[in-house]
Amino acid sequence: MSFSCPLCHQPLSREKNSYICPQRHQFDMAKEGYVNLLPVQHKRSRDPGDSAEMMQARRAFLDAGHYQPLRDAIVAQLRERLDDKATAVLDIGCGEGYYTHAFADALPEITTFGLDVSKVAIKAAAKRYPQVTFCVASSHRLPFSDTSMDAIIRIYAPCKAEELARVVKPGGWVITATPGPRHLMELKGLIYNEVHLHAPHAEQLEGFTLQQSAELCYPMRLRGDEAVALLQMTPFAWRAKPEVWQTLAAKEVFDCQTDFNIHLWQRSY
């Protein structure tokens, strides 16, 4: 399978270094190997998604292995849930591909797609991980045919439930990872006067049945520069005063707790 046209939703066919639909809408592949399927009219800003600075901080932090237990847990679920008839999986909001390439390596017989709205992140991902098929696209308008995916992975990424239901095959899976109540409490303690437990959103995915929920919690011991990179990755970075950044950078060791919720949803038959 391949992509569908983001303009007319018909299948895209690969012709040399381009994807072309029956209406002759054409999308050229970049030299790094990805394709941009985000039409200008679907952009909310000139350069949507993470900046180069945010992407580089996330890559440095993830490459150090601090979130590898989360990655390993999702890989284990994919191996357990997908049978030998599976053909395609999609990582939504894949960023620079840290999780995505592990899915591809664990499932070599399956085509692994990575999607993100950030061109900067996808360019870096495609250059580093040629075993994955990457695209720049909106998670709210997935450029894939109906019932084309055996599994979709969403790690912190938004996506309309109706799009998930449209793209996932009957009996297929959506795996989500979201922050649990105590996720990064120590980091929040440097920023906020009062730190409250994160209230997990009780998500409902129409057309899916929640088959399993699991918690993954473990401590991290970070260097100062790693703690700074972690803060840059978070949605509360913009609330951090200059002295918070300076305090973190000066630390030899910063201990912090992770708390992830992993949910497995199965598409109704």
UniProtKB/Swiss-Prot annotation:
Belongs to the methyltransferase superfamily. RlmA family. This is 23S rRNA (guanine(745)-N(1))-methyltransferase. InterPro entries: 23S_rRNA_MeTrnsfrase_RlmA, Methyltransf_25, RlmA_N, rRNA_m1G-MeTrfase_A_prd, SAM-dependent_MTases_sf. Specifically methylates the guanosine in position 745 of 23S rRNA. The lineage of its organism: Bacteria, Pseudomonadati, Pseudomonadota, Gammaproteobacteria, Enterobacterales. Its EC number is 2.1.1.187. CDD domains: AdoMet_MTases (cd02440). GO terms for biological process: rRNA base methylation. It catalyses: guanosine(745) in 23S rRNA + S-adenosyl-L-methionine = N(1)-methylguanosine(745) in 23S rRNA + S-adenosyl-L-homocysteine + H(+). It comes from Escherichia coli (strain K12). GO terms for molecular function: 23S rRNA (guanine(745)-N(1))-methyltransferase activity; methyltransferase activity; rRNA (guanine-N1-)-methyltransferase activity; zinc ion binding. Gene3D superfamilies: Vaccinia Virus protein VP39. S-adenosyl-L-methionine binds at Y67, E96, G97, H183. Homodimer. Keywords: Metal-binding, Methyltransferase, rRNA processing, S-adenosyl-L-methionine, Transferase, Zinc. Zn(2+) binds at C5, C8, C21, H25.
